[in-house]
Each structure stands twice: as C-alpha cells, then as structure tokens.
Amino acid sequence: MLHSNIYSLQTEATNKILSTSSLEELESLRLYYFGKSGVITACLRSISTINNIEERKSIGSAVNSICAELKSLMNSQKEKLHKIQIDAQLMEDKIDISLPVRPKQIAKLHPISKTLHEVKHIFVSLGFKLSDGPELEDEFHVFDALNTHKHHPAREENDTFYLKKLVNNKRIVLRTHTSSVQIRTMESNNGNYPIKIIAPGKVYRNDWDATHSPMFHQIEGLYIDKNINMGHLKYCINYFLKKFFGENIQIRFRNSYFPFTEPSAEVDIKCSQKNWMEILGCGMVHHNVLTNVNINPEQYSGFAFGIGIERIAMIKYNINDLRKFYSNKLQWLTHHGFCFTNLIT
C-alpha cells in the first residue's frame, strides 16, 4: 500500500512543481513535501514500521530515489523561476537610451593659478630663474637688509604679523613680501653673476577689505650684474605688461619712494580714457641693500620689481572683489575658472 502511495505522490508533486509560477509558491511546496511535518517526510518515518526487511529495503530505496528526483526537479524549477524574475525586473528597469547623459563636471583652474603660471612663463622667457624661500622670516631678511629702518610704519604690529616666540633672540614675522628671497639669493651667490631671479609666493599683511587680503600672492624680480641701468628695467617691465595685458596697453612710469630702491618708480596702466591704475612698484636696487649682502655697489648694480598677482588678475579678468578669490564658491570658480588647455606651455 505504501509502495503505490509513494509513486502517486511523486506524480502529484511533479505536476505541482512544474506548474509553479513564483519562487514563493515553490518554497511553499518544498515545505509541504519536505518540511518537518511534510508529506514525504511522514512517508520516510513510516518505513521503520514495516516488519518485512526485504519490503522495507525496497520501499526505502524507492522513497529515497523519489526524494532525490523531486529535490532535483525543485532546484531546476527554482533556477528557471529565478531567471524569469530577473528578466522581468530588467524589462521593468530598462534604461531609456534616448535620454541625454548627465553632464560631467570638468575641473577648472583657479584665476590665481592661471595668472601665476602666465607671469612665470613670461619672465622665464626673458631668462629669469625661479627662486623660493621661507614664509616665516627673521626681521633682518624682511626689513633690515632691505634698508627699512626700525621705525618704518611697515614694521608696526598693526601692519605685520609677528610671532610671539623669539627664535635665537630674533623676532620672526610672516614675510610681507618675497623680497626676502632676493636677500637670501644675493647672500648665497658666492660671486656668480648675473643674478636674475623671480620669487613667486605667498605674503602676509594685516589688512582685509575688497582690495586687500591678509594673505596674497606676489612675484618679485631681481637682476644684478655690471652696468645694469634704468633702461634695462623699463624694457623688462614694458615687455611683461604688453605680453600679459596685450600689445596696445598704455604704460607710464611715475617717480616714487621705496627704502630698498633708488631711484624708485610706480608703474601705471591706462584702464579707460581718463583713468590710470597703479600696477606694480620697481626701481634700481639701493646701494645699502647691496652692501648689506656683501655686493660691491661700485662694481655691480641691478633692478628689482614687485607684482601683486591678485591685483593684475582682478584687472585682466574683471573681478571687482579680491575676497572672492578665497570664497570657495563652486559657482564663482566655474564662471571665472579656466580650462587646463588654456595654459601657456
């Protein structure tokens, strides 16, 4: 009786397994037949009640074979239903290839980085070499060696950032200009001429408004050799300004005063029909400065100049507030930034 029942149970289970249409339905069938209280599980338990050993072996072998076939069929049906489920989901989630892709955000070069690169490129084409120095400096390299006396307004604490702690009994400042690099270069020159350098870098002054920042970028230049005169300086400055702003730019030199140059000049460019704008300071290196770094002013002369990078960037790219350079606003940088392909190489 059990023998005939198990085969009819196989036929019934096979038909039900093949007719399932979902993984959930198939799992319910598995529990119905093979769970702890399942129909086939009960048949397996009842085998032990058969007294005839040969009959018990025959029925046990048949039940085990049927169990293996049904479980194999369930696994095959499970794979089939799983594939159908995935295909249906893919059809539901298909991508509309007619839709435009999201635009890629391309990195932009900051206007200050662009300006620094361009200025350095122009002066390197004139034979200047790049030179660098520390941003934390002692007073000698920032002021004393540059002929700036102890009572000069630039040395007051409301204009300059001083460190509270002395180093080797010297007051340390955040450099107010990269002229300190010029001093260090002349000190370590060891009689090798000409000295022809530009010193780009960050400088610090205690000021903050639409046209001033407590930290800004500067490039200073220095050219020391025999028989260097004001004509060399004017040619160099004119060449730079025409390359940077365009050949049609109008330039004028005005007498001025700086403690580290004599004669000194400020250079203006014409921004409209009536208005001139100061763009940089320059002059012939003062004899006292040369003497302070053990260069004989009777044999050697030279010129120096200083350019504020933010200032010329504001003029060239029509930016009216210096503070926007450091605002970190992505919208502003996207508008005023430059593609890397625009770099001069």
Swiss-Prot record:
This is Phenylalanine--tRNA ligase alpha subunit. Its main location: cytoplasm. GO terms for molecular function: ATP binding; magnesium ion binding; phenylalanine-tRNA ligase activity; tRNA binding. Binds 2 magnesium ions per tetramer. NCBIfam families: pheS. Its EC number is 6.1.1.20. Mg(2+) binds at E262. Tetramer of two alpha and two beta subunits. GO terms for biological process: phenylalanyl-tRNA aminoacylation. One of its GO terms (cellular component) is cytoplasm. Pfam families: Phe_tRNA-synt_N, tRNA-synt_2d. It is an enzyme of class 6 (ligase). Its cofactor is Mg(2+). It catalyses: tRNA(Phe) + L-phenylalanine + ATP = L-phenylalanyl-tRNA(Phe) + AMP + diphosphate + H(+). The keyword Metal-binding applies. Keywords: Aminoacyl-tRNA synthetase, ATP-binding, Cytoplasm, Ligase, Magnesium, Metal-binding, Nucleotide-binding, Protein biosynthesis. InterPro entries: aa-tRNA-synth_II, aa-tRNA-synth_II/BPL/LPL, Phe-tRNA-synth_IIc_asu, Phe-tRNA_ligase_II_N, Phe_tRNA_ligase_alpha1_bac, Phenylalanyl-tRNA_Synthase, tRNA-bd_arm.
